[in-house]
Design a protein with these regions (language model features):
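Conserved catalytic core of the tyrosine transesterase superfamily
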Residues: 1-303
Length: 303
């Protein structure tokens, strides 16, 4: 049976969706883009290494090097899948994705959190929701998708120490994990739950827009955070994911290990945590400063 490129992509994506939901969408975009580029070639066996090279060269004027490298990983995984099934003679080893290190990104600090939180009033529902969201992102290091997926039933009873936990599902790995937050954040949670449980709303999600009765969109949360960071004069480009990166750096700054980062951020692969070992600009300056030799003026004059 001759395998067409269109069918091979569909079959691969269906297999991919059985164990991950977040990667499915981005894989689909890149693979369909590749399919459109290689036309009029229609079958999988017609593809060779020259097609891969030409495709990625065509992306250079429109996309970043990181995006092109990601596309290379997508195609490599795709061809490994079909190489394993014996449907292509093309050797995926010819695809060598280059790993580019992203520029130093802005992260949220504990002081940034306080500055943004101080702008919000707990007696206003919209402010309370925003305040709860940024505190949960900081305390737990959750991904935004994980936070917005939380249902009311996922939240566990409060412990005697004032801490509380919730069960979250990671779209990336399709695994359930436990997240925990502190007593200050739990005070916000209790206040919000008192209102949320009284809402006449069919949705079981924790964080819903009272006007639409639907869960908040990632774009809405991003807009809030941008507005809050500007109002707090942070002079940073803050995203919801900046809280996760900030939490990792905070753990390391407090003397925690990469193992602690891996556990608290719930990384499936331990090597994912090693990216945080790369020193931020501030931590690099602090470390370098400790090991610089300082000479007195007199010593320099007599030398």
């Amino acid at each position: 049976m001759i395998m067409t490129i269109k069918d091979s992509i569909q079959i691969y994506l269906e297999w991919k969706q059985t164990h991950t939901s977040s990667a499915y969408a981005t894989y689909k975009i890149r693979l369909q883009q590749f399919e459109a580029f290689v036309k009029p070639k229609a079958t999988l066996n017609e593809i060779d290494g020259d097609d891969i090279i030409a495709f990625h060269r065509s992306l250079e004027n429109q996309y970043s090097l990181n995006t092109i490298a990601y596309s290379a990983r997508v195609l490599k995984n795709f061809f490994w899948f079909w190489h394993g099934r014996g449907k292509t003679t093309f050797n995926p080893k010819e695809i060598i994705p280059i790993r580019y290190v992203s520029a130093d990104k802005d992260i949220v600090t504990a002081e940034d959190l306080d500055d943004m939180s101080d702008l919000l009033e707990v007696n206003n529902l919209q402010d309370l929701q925003k305040k709860l969201i940024i505190h949960l992102l900081w305390d737990t290091g959750m991904r935004l998708s994980e936070l917005l997926d939380i249902k009311i039933d996922d939240i566990n009873e409060q412990g005697i120490d004032g801490l509380r936990t919730a069960k979250v599902r990671t779209r990336k790995s399709m695994r359930y994990n436990l997240v925990i937050w502190g007593s200050d954040t739990n005070d916000l949670m209790n206040r919000y739950l008192g209102i949320r449980l009284c809402m006449d709303c069919e949705s079981k999600k924790l964080l819903v827009n009272p006007k639409t009765e639907k869960v908040f969109t990632p774009r809405s949360v991003q807009r809030w955070i941008t507005e809050l960071s500007e109002m707090a004069n942070l002079d940073k480009k803050i995203t919801p994911h900046s809280f996760r990166h900030g939490k990792a750096n905070y753990i390391l700054d407090q003397g925690g290990s990469v193992r602690d980062v891996s556990a608290l951020l719930r990384h499936v692969k331990p090597e994912s945590s090693f990216q945080y070992m790369q020193l931020s600009k501030k931590r690099y300056e602090d470390v370098a400063r400790r090991y610089l030799t300082t000479f007195s003026t007199n010593a320099l004059q007599t030398a």
